Curated annotation (Swiss-Prot):
It comes from the Bacteria. It catalyses: RNA(n) + a ribonucleoside 5'-triphosphate = RNA(n+1) + diphosphate. It is an enzyme of class 2 (transferase). InterPro entries: DNA-dir_RNA_pol_bsu_ext_1_sf, DNA-dir_RNA_pol_bsu_external_1, DNA-dir_RNA_pol_su2, DNA-dir_RNAP_su2_dom, DNA-dir_RNAP_su2_hyb_sf, RNA_pol_bsu_bac, RNA_pol_bsu_CS, RNA_pol_bsu_protrusion. This is DNA-directed RNA polymerase subunit beta. The RNAP catalytic core consists of 2 alpha, 1 beta, 1 beta' and 1 omega subunit. When a sigma factor is associated with the core the holoenzyme is formed, which can initiate transcription.
Length: 1370
């Protein structure tokens, strides 16, 4: 049984002190889960939940015609089989998609208009093809037209209600104006806002504002009802014109002053003197002595507002209306008419203002009908309003699910903000919602309370792939719905079938547009595995329904306290998108409502538990949360009396018993990229940002090496990115080579199963960024592998760990000015040993079309091309694999027919003599573009169905078939062997009941005991003759085993035949294309001057010189350093992490060399163990080394020679004392410095130099991709100057400043040449060419074309510019 040492492949010494609580969730889970929930592809139709596609179909169907005579109902949807697998789609330029079929039911009714009823006349059900939907690959990407794309998740403002104010910026007085906004997922926005006069207005869809009371009246509320809802009322008992009494209401009277002395009813003593403040105690005393009314002067009532209509019950007449102000005459009339009591609105007091009453006074609309018509008139000014139309329009605005959808999230936010308990599936507005929103806003204004923060992650949510596509699909279905309704009306429905009504084109078009051109559908960044993973975990605030770069301010872009553990504060692009495009943190996940959650350990009674809760930003705001590095004892109790914690994002010191939660890990704060940077805690944030961004640009190298100094999550990134191959089941490796691994699976009960897993390795495939994707097996024949084990490395992975660069020996010192301004001095050894060499793959494509003049042909027979140029082409005209090519070489020979041109008499004569017909085609071969040099690694040919295949196609087809045959053979052999094993186990010690023979050959004699060897030699065709003496049950079991075997064999064969059939069928090509050839060229790029390199701490630079190894500074033992960096690049950048990495890297290298030496010298195991125990902690030593055999340890020698691997987790890394101890263990100076000698003179440098091992990356900005040279090339049409840029094969611009330098040197003729014949003097160019041919090198400059352009521009401005030609001699 292999030990953990061989199983894990790589042991890392971990400097972290904090134990792992939970595993990091799968890094691309968000993408995959979202799309699975959208499709619900593997869920039976009756069990599908109301979300994604199901919800869209249910919300649009049933579709009824305008008269109600027919209805089209949705029954279910299903997916068909995928036509092409992922690899085929990538090769052929197809989309990886599955057809969608829907079952719909057309119900036709008989309508009885008089009775108002309808009865079913006819029901027709039919399955209809409904276009296709792209499927997601296992790695969370989509393949659209042969390219891998990623749908980036969008971070947008959550639907719901938000309260805000203008911070005093709107009005000149600086008064704070409060506002509220109800945002639905779909439908009209509702804005409530105060003006400077405290009148409350409302806007619908940002149109003209009108008083909020108009809307409330349209909802059916009366004036009196509204006033009593917003204001408390108090009863007044009128005695006379001079004296009255008011009811004792503690809620209203609290804090007011006594109008007169208040006397005890029995004793007559003064309880409360006049003008004394009425507090809680005073009011309670009054109630205790039985005082229910307080005396007041009637004159105090003047100016107060009535809460109800005042009615003279004698006559039934309304004396005064609700909301009227009382004046002296009115008061007199009340007394005269004998009105005993009135109710007044309480408008003055704490947190109460008359703003709503003032709004009502301003509002001239009195009835609900008027209000509805007023709203209709405001929103539809051009349409004539009628009450019926206005009512329907108003109801559709907020109360019709077809037009308005708050979404579950919107309802959730509304319930939380307004304190409601409405079910989440109630997704339109209610009357109460609007009323309560108005009341909440008025309360907020009166109390000057806090408003919502729109940048809080509780108010922003993530829309992942599923939801984005769901919204698009709905748009397509709504377009289709209109067309269906029109068809139902125009045609006789009885005669129609469902397929006559449904046309899926609008839906397909919307889906195609979304995947092809949406801002959120992006070409995947596939430079290396990390760039893939970060692209899938990216969140963008841009895109449809989001922000735009120009409008986004600082607040949206800034880091917010709620980002903690949810969004990385470091990883974001530099430039205009900073802060708008962010990355999900390591442990973060998105909940069903789209809010980002982060995990916390629960804390009970000041001790941390092992179980974890996921909290959103809204959930965590009231809890104190401790940090992951808070000191705990073995039982999880806090050691300190005051613990550093966060409450609502603010740092505080809290006693342990108050803490409710604790972070799970120090790196939960940052994203995957940032958590790959060791000693991140010692880097300045700006440099950490560059470091995490530049790791994504690292090019995969030929020889991958994991970093000596890592952080411990390299393995997780490699596994989750999908570039490394992970074993699907436990099993034994039966066969392994560079292109495939065959594993025989072991059943769960430990028995050898008959299952076979064949893993095909990707060999030298081109990525989106032209880097090379190549997989290498890590297992050997006979190895036992467990489920989830990494069995093959991909690009930029080393033994299942992410490996973006190389560990190199660096020195921080200046060297001859070659590391000025971040330049990097590199040793020649790096080029010789291919340390930073990478392979880049270019794809070239040529298409033969059927043109109007005839068919283009791919052929070796090309006019006017010598045999030398054709030497590498095969008989089909396609270059052979392995050929070395240079610019302008022919890759694929192609000729195109050209139109018959008028022949000269000479040509006619030649034609007549030689009968030559070759000149009617022209050479349009695919040639190598400038700047590309490399080796052909593959050529793929696609021919249209029905076109005869050429030799090359047949050869490629034969190779593919033989590969498939090999797979089939292996699979059948494993099934055969495992069946034999099962039979042998069943027939152990059993005796054959009869002889089995084939002709004269006897396989088993009668009475012979069965053995595995006998059964292996027995052909499977004779297995049904196996019989056992005395045991009929065994025969039954044999029958079952045989049936199982035949079934598996049949399955394998049918799959194989299907694949071969697919191969032999012609290819689907675009219209007019006969044949398409793709040629792949591998270009090997060594590190050279001008290439950009970087460390992981934002320390980037350009290679300035490659120096012979013997000239590089060297150690006292003669070892030269590999790279010399500028020490001035550290202090001002404040990325000290690189220095600590260098120190610990040096120690790791030294210790590794010591261990390798000890193993080579075969030291005693005791000594070896002591050394290992000093380096590794108890757990690591116990797990990996304690039980390892001598052979296993010796197998680590090559690894140890490069150094031992260490992990310094983010925010929990190695401390200074540990680094010092590590350096002294390695036997080097604790200062991390060494004396270096100058390679040129052999003299030591004056001072010791900081040296060590740093992990360096080669970035994608390669000089070969940027540099080019132009001799003769294309010119711009208008100015006739050479084009610019490498893509256009342009020249360098000689601009204004360059002209000044030439003038300064007085180089007039050189300058004249630059500005005329070498640039845009067309006639002069031609003359110059002729002169050079004749051997005359004199210059005769003419008029530059740009001067003519200037003249034409001036003429366009109506200036009459003419050139006056002077005659010579005047």
């Amino acid at each position: 049984m292999p030990t953990a040492l061989t199983h894990e492949y790589r042991v890392r010494k971990n400097f972290g002190k904090i134990h792992k609580i939970i595993d990091i969730p799968n890094l691309i889970q968000m993408q995959k889960e979202s799309y699975e929930l959208f499709l619900q592809r593997d869920v039976p139709s009756e069990a599908r939940s109301e979300r994604g596609l199901q919800e869209v179909f249910k919300s649009v169907f049933p579709i009824e015609d305008f008269s109600g005579t027919a209805s089209l109902e949705f029954v279910q949807y299903s997916f068909g089989e995928v036509k092409y697998e992922v690899e085929e789609c990538l090769a052929r330029g197809m989309t990886y998609e599955a057809p969608v079929k829907i079952v719909v039911r057309l119900v036709v009714y008989d309508v009885d208009k008089e009775a108002g009823t309808r009865s079913i006349r006819d029901i027709k059900e039919q399955e209809i093809y409904f276009g296709t939907l792209p499927l997601m690959t296992d790695n969370g990407t989509f393949i659209i037209n042969g390219t891998e794309r990623v749908i980036v998740s969008q971070l947008h403002r959550s639907p719901g209600i938000f309260f805000d104010h203008d911070r005093g910026k709107t009005h000149s007085s600086g008064k704070i104006l409060y506002s509220a906004r109800i945002i639905p997922l779909r439908g009209s926005w509702l804005d409530l806002e105060f003006d400077p006069k405290d009148i409350l207005y409302i806007r619908i869809d940002r149109r003209r504002k009108f008083p909020v009371t108009v809307l409330l009246k349209a909802l059916g509320y009366a004036t009196e009802e509204l006033l009593n809802y917003f204001y408390p009322s108090e009863k007044i008992f009128l005695k006379s014109e001079a004296q009255s009494e008011k009811e004792l209401n503690p809620d209203i009277l609290m804090g007011s002053r006594a109008p007169e002395d208040i006397l005890h009813p029995q004793t007559g003593e003064v309880l409360i003197k006049k003008n004394r403040k009425l507090g809680k105690q005073a009011l309670r005393r009054l109630q205790e002595v039985g005082i229910n009314r307080l005396p007041m002067k009637s004159t105090e009532l003047i100016g107060q507002v009535l809460a109800q209509d005042v009615i003279d019950y004698g006559t039934g007449e309304i004396v005064a209306e609700c909301n009227d102000s009382i004046d002296a005459d009115m008061l007199k009339e009340f007394v005269e008419r004998g009105v005993g009591e009135i109710e007044l609105l309480h408008l003055e007091g704490q947190d109460v203002s008359p703003s709503f009453r003032n709004t009502l006074l301003m509002d001239k609309v009195n009835t609900q009908e008027d209000a509805l018509i007023e709203i209709y008139r405001r929103l539809r000014p051009s349409n004539p309003p009628t009450l019926e139309v206005a009512t329907e329009f108003f109801n559709n605005l907020f109360f019709n699910p077809d037009h308005y959808d708050l979404s579950e999230v919107g309802r959730l936010k509304l319930n939380l903000q307004l304190g409601l308990e409405v079910p989440l599936d109630y997704r339109t507005l209610r009357k109460d919602d609007i009323l309560m929103a108005v009341r909440q806003l008025i309360r907020l204004k009166d109390s000057q309370g806090p408003v919502d923060d729109i940048d809080n992650l509780g108010n922003r949510r993530v829309r992942a792939v599923g939801e984005l596509l769901e919204n698009q699909y709905r748009i397509g279905l709504v377009r289709m719905e209109r067309a269906i309704k029109e068809r139902m009306t125009l045609q006789e429905v009885e005669a129609l079938m469902p397929h006559d009504l449904i046309n899926a084109k609008p839906v397909s078009a919307v889906v195609k547009e979304f995947f092809g051109t949406s801002q959120l559908s992006q070409f995947m960044d596939q430079t290396n595995p990390l760039s893939e993973i970060t692209h899938k975990r990216r969140l963008s605030a841009l895109g449809p329904g989001g922000l735009t770069r120009e409008r986004a301010g600082f607040e949206v872009r800034d880091v917010h306290p709620t980002h903690y553990g949810r969004i990385c504060p470091i990883e974001t692009p530099e430039g205009p998108n900073i802060g708008l495009i962010v990355s999900l943190s390591t442990y973060a996940r998105v909940n069903p409502y789209g809010f980002i959650e982060t995990p916390y350990r629960k804390v009970d009674g000041s001790s941390a538990r092992k179980d974890v809760s996921y909290l959103t930003a809204m959930d965590e705001k009231e809890y104190p949360i401790a940090q992951a590095n808070a000191p705990l004892d073995e039982k999880g109790r806090f050691l300190l009396d005051l613990v550093s914690a966060r409450v609502a994002g603010e740092p505080v010191m809290v006693p342990p018993n108050e803490i409710r939660y604790m972070d799970v890990s120090p790196n939960q704060l940052v994203s995957v990229s940032a958590s790959l940077i060791p000693f991140l805690e010692h880097d300045d944030a700006n440099r950490a940002l560059m470091g995490s961004n530049m790791q994504r640009q690292a090019v995969p190298l030929i020889q991958t090496r994991a970093p000596l100094v890592g952080t411990g999550i390299e393995r997780i990134v490699a596994k989750d990115s999908g570039v490394a191959i992970v074993a699907r089941r436990t099993g034994v490796v039966e066969y392994v080579d560079a292109t495939r691994i065959v594993i025989r699976a072991i059943e769960d009960n430990g028995e050898m199963g008959s299952g076979v897993d064949i893993y095909k390795l990707i060999k030298f495939q081109r990525s989106n960024q032209n880097t090379c994707i190549n997989q290498k097996p890590l297992v050997q024949h006979g190895d036992l592998v467990t489920k989830g084990q990494i069995i093959a490395d991909g690009p930029s992975t080393d033994h299942g760990e992410l490996a973006l660069g190389r560990n190199v020996m660096v020195a921080f010192m200046s060297w001859g000015g070659y590391n000025f301004e971040d330049s990097i001095l590199v040793s020649e050894r790096i080029g010789k040993e291919d340390v930073f060499t990478s392979i880049h793959i270019e794809e070239f494509e040529v298409v033969a079309r059927d043109t109007k003049l005839g068919k283009e042909d791919i052929t070796r027979d090309i006019p006017n091309v010598g045999e030398e140029a054709l030497k590498n082409l095969d008989e089909s005209g396609i270059i052979r694999v392995g050929a070395y090519i240079k610019p302008n070489d022919i890759l694929v020979g192609k000729v195109t027919p050209k139109g018959e041109s008028q022949l000269t008499p000479e040509e006619k004569l030649l034609r007549a003599i030689f009968g030559e017909k070759a000149s009617d085609v022209k050479d349009t071969s695919l040639r190598v573009p400038p700047g590309v040099e490399g080796i052909i690694i593959d050529a793929k040919v696609f021919s249209r169905k029905g076109v005869e295949k050429d030799e090359r196609t047949k050869t490629i087809e034969d190779q593919e078939i033989s590969r498939l045959m090999k797979d089939q053979r292996d699979e059948l052999e494993i099934i055969f062997k495992s069946t034999v094993k099962r039979l042998a186990k069943l027939l152990e010690n059993q005796v054959s009941d009869s002889a089995i023979k084939d002709g004269k050959k006897v396989y088993i004699k009668k009475g012979e005991v069965f053995t595995e060897e006998i059964l292996l030699n027995l052909p499977s065709g004779h297995w049904d003759q196996l019989t056992v003496a005395k045991d009929p049950t065994v025969s039954m079991e044999i029958e079952n085993i045989l049936a199982n075997y035949r079934e598996q064999v049949q399955l394998v064969k049918s799959l194989f035949e299907e694949k071969i059939g697919k191969l032999k069928r012609g290819d689907e090509l675009p219209p007019g294309v006969i044949k398409m050839v793709k040629v792949y060229v591998a270009v090997k790029r060594k590190l050279q001057v001008g290439d950009k390199m970087a460390g992981r701490h934002g320390n980037k630079g350009v290679v300035s010189r490659i120096l012979p190894a013997e000239d590089m500074p060297y150690f006292p033992d003669g070892t030269p350093v590999d790279i010399v960096l500028n020490p001035l690049g550290v202090p001002s950048r404040m990325n000290v992490g690189q220095v600590l990495e260098t120190h610990i890297g040096w120690a790791a290298k030294g210790i590794g060399m010591q261990l390798a030496q000890m193993l080579e010298e075969c030291r005693e195991r005791e000594t070896m163990n002591e050394k290992l125990q000093r380096i590794y902690n108890k757990l690591e030593f116990g797990t990996y080394f304690k039980d390892a055999s001598e052979r296993e340890l010796r197998g680590l020698i090559p690894d140890f020679k490069e150094g031992i691997h260490v992990a310094s987790p983010v925010f929990d890394g190695a401390e200074e004392a540990e680094i010092r101890a590590f350096l002294s263990e390695a036997g080097v100076s604790e200062t991390g410095q060494s004396v270096l000698y100058d390679g040129r003179t052999g003299m030591p440098f004056d001072q010791p130099v900081t040296v060590g091992v740093m992990y360096m990356l080669k970035l994608h900005h390669l000089v070969d991709d940027k540099i080019h040279a132009r001799s003769i090339g294309p010119y711009s049409l208008v100015t006739q100057q050479p084009l610019g840029g490498k893509a256009q094969f342009g020249g360098q611009r000689l601009g204004e400043m360059e002209v000044w330098t030439m003038e300064a040197y007085g180089a007039a003729y050189a300058l004249q040449e630059f500005l005329t014949v070498k640039s845009d003097d067309v006639a002069g160019r031609t003359r110059m060419y002729e002169k050079i041919v004749k051997g005359d090198n004199t210059l005769e400059a003419g008029l530059p074309e740009s001067f003519n352009v200037l003249v034409k521009e001036l003429q366009a401005l109506a200036l009459d510019v003419r050139l006056l030609e002077e005659e010579e001699g005047n």
